[in-house]
């Protein structure tokens, strides 16, 4: 059966006054072209721009090639495409698709690539909460944490009647001698033990942790922070917090009593009969 090709061109948002189109008539191919749709999604919610706004750039503006917004966008889209290792960016810094996503197609200086290499991105990731002489990019942890919840709230046109916050800790296996490396008996490997909080498909919190702690460590504090932020927009919302996860019931009670509106604590399905409705 003869293959029928669609010769139409599909246009995307221009970058630096250059048109960006997708064609299906052959030529040089890329396996990452679908990422252009990811870029369109980002522009709809402004994720990268808002994430970049959580950083402070203390570098001399006239001397830099890669802005914080470009660095953050390059790293976010790189991870989304499966390029988790910074060393990959020594090649990806020349990739036209990633350049389109980052919004930077050409370098200002002749001796630079359009995007950053691993060393520059490493300095971004090793930044601190405060600017120092040797750390010129700082991040605001509270703003980054709040951004997850802001995106969740904005994803709802109308507040739902009830939401369920699902807390979970899982293993992030390590294959080298990374800082904070510990062996975890349950997972039978060296790993980190990150804490995640979801509401359905929405990620509300992601906390990197070492594996030498209890799985529930910090869970109540994170839940309290998220609930307080949700309450500013949805003050009458019923919030369900599963009572599993190894969190001490007494600590859950403390969290519940600290809320002005209805908060609902329940055990796992195997103990559903013992759930409690708290005010």
Where do the model's predicted regions map?
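Dynamic "connector" segments at or just before major functional cores
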Residues: 1-214, 218-233, 259
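Polar helix-capping/helix-linker motif
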Residues: 95, 249, 269-270
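A structural signal for short, well-ordered beta-strand segments and their strand-loop junctions
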Residues: 164-166, 242, 264-266
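Acidic/histidine-rich, metal-coordinating catalytic segments
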Residues: 168, 237-247
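A short acidic (Asp/Glu
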Residues: 176, 249-255, 274-278
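Short beta->alpha junction loops/turns
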Residues: 209, 245-246, 269
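Catalytic or ion-translocation cores adjacent to nucleophile or general acid/base/metal-coordination motifs
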Residues: 217, 224, 260-279
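Active-site loop/helix belt of alpha/beta enzymes
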Residues: 240, 248-262
């Amino acid at each position: 059966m003869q293959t029928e090709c669609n010769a139409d061109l599909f246009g995307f948002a221009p970058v630096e006054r250059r048109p960006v189109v997708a064609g299906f008539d052959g030529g040089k191919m890329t396996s990452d072209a679908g990422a252009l749709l990811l870029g369109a999604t980002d522009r709809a919610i402004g994720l990268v721009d808002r994430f970049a706004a959580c950083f402070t750039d203390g570098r001399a503006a006239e001397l830099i090639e890669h802005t914080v917004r470009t660095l953050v966008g390059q790293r976010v889209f790189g991870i989304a495409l499966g390029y988790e290792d910074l060393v990959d960016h020594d090649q990806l810094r020349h990739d036209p698709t990633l350049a389109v996503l980052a919004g930077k197609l050409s370098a200002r200086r002749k001796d630079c690539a359009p995007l950053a290499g691993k060393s520059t991105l490493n300095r971004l990731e090793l930044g601190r909460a405060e600017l120092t002489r040797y750390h010129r990019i700082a991040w605001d942890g509270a703003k980054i944490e709040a951004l997850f919840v802001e995106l969740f709230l904005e994803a709802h046109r109308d507040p739902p009647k009830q939401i369920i916050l699902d807390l979970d800790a899982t293993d992030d296996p390590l294959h080298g001698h990374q800082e904070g490396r510990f062996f975890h008996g349950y997972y039978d490997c060296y790993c980190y033990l990150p804490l995640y909080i979801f509401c359905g498909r929405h990620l509300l919190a992601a906390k990197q942790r070492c594996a030498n702690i209890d799985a529930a460590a910090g869970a109540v504090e994170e839940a309290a922070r998220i609930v307080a932020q949700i309450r500013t927009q949805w003050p009458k919302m019923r919030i369900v917090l599963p009572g599993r996860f190894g969190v001490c019931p007494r600590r859950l009670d403390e969290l519940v009593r600290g809320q002005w509106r209805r908060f609902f604590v329940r055990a796992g399905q195997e103990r559903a009969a013992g759930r409690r409705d708290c005010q």
